[in-house]
């Protein structure tokens, strides 16, 4: 069975840290979907469409990475995609505790 992970975030902007997480995730998962989420509480630097295009350009030669815009609940988006895993980055124990609570 194909192991598909969703890497959700606002990615405004998509950083080298985000790229590192995706690249490391590709050693574990068959496919990663980068979910560019709408966050009405954040004033964005880039439009969601521009964020999607920029990330697609980074991974244009890698069929294992797909980039999709979404709004709504991340869990619903996971089910819609058939993703079995969430890929998350953690900078410290505070991030870990926050993610664990979700």
Regions from the PLM with identified roles:
Residues 1-102:
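Nucleotidyltransferase catalytic core that binds NTPs
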